[in-house]
Amino acid sequence: MKMKSIYFIAGLLLMIVQGSWQNPLQDTEEKSRSFKASQSEPLDESRQLNEVKRHSQGTFTSDYSKYLDSRRAQDFVQWLMSTKRNGQQGQEDKENDKFPDQLSSNAISKRHSEFERHAEGTYTSDITSYLEGQAAKEFIAWLVNGRGRRDFPEKALMAEEMGRRHADGTFTSDINKILDDMAAKEFLKWLINTKVTQRDLLGEYQ
């Protein structure tokens, strides 16, 4: 009985000692866990704060960049529109300034060309009439002097033959007059039917 009681007491003592050892160990483990948790919580919070800051900074930077890009685009579009308006206005002003000058220059050139045509036509008509009259007079005088019969060989030969056959001077004179009249008529007919220009007449009588 004594031995059993001793063993029983020894077992109780062992259980008490083990319980006393386990409680401090558990306390230390819990304290270490709580300490680790308390240290890890600020780290997690600071990490989350940093992530939130980075996210907010990135979002703000992105939004600000988009705003600046849109503002630059608007400024560029306004600059283009103002430049285009100024260019169109300047072009219209230049065209408006040139338009009266063009009208006046066209009117002056038109009047000048009409005056030149009128003067040239009048001068050509006058010089043509004068040269025709002079040519007719000179040609008739040339025929009367007997130097134009080469242009009409058949009629000239006939007149010469008739002059040789007939010694009568009156007949020969009448034939010469007839030939002169025929030559003058043919020359005038040639002048009428032929388009004689001022250059040809001036070149012929220079």
Curated annotation (Swiss-Prot):
It is found in: Secreted. Induction: Produced in the A cells of the islets of Langerhans in response to a drop in blood sugar concentration. Its main location: secreted. GO terms for biological process: adenylate cyclase-activating G protein-coupled receptor signaling pathway; adenylate cyclase-modulating G protein-coupled receptor signaling pathway; cellular response to glucagon stimulus; gluconeogenesis; glucose homeostasis; negative regulation of apoptotic process; negative regulation of appetite; negative regulation of execution phase of apoptosis. Residues 86-109, 151-163, 199-206 form a propeptide. Transmembrane segments: none annotated. Coiled coil: none annotated. InterPro entries: Glucagon, Glucagon_GIP_secretin_VIP. Keywords: Amidation, Cleavage on pair of basic residues, Hormone, Secreted, Signal. Residues 44-54 have a biased composition (Basic and acidic residues). The keyword Secreted applies. GO terms for cellular component: cytoplasm; extracellular space; plasma membrane. Residues 27-57 are annotated as: Disordered. The keyword Signal applies. Proglucagon is post-translationally processed in a tissue-specific manner in pancreatic A cells and intestinal L cells. In pancreatic A cells, the major bioactive hormone is glucagon cleaved by PCSK2/PC2. In the intestinal L cells PCSK1/PC1 liberates GLP-1 and GLP-2. GLP-1 is further N-terminally truncated by post-translational processing in the intestinal L cells resulting in GLP-1(7-37) GLP-1-(7-36)amide. GO terms for molecular function: glucagon receptor binding; hormone activity; identical protein binding. The modification Arginine amide is found at residue 147. The record marks 54-55, 85-86, 111-112, 117-118, 150-151, 165-166 as: Cleavage. Residues 1-22 form the signal peptide. Belongs to the glucagon family. This is Pro-glucagon. The gene is GCG.
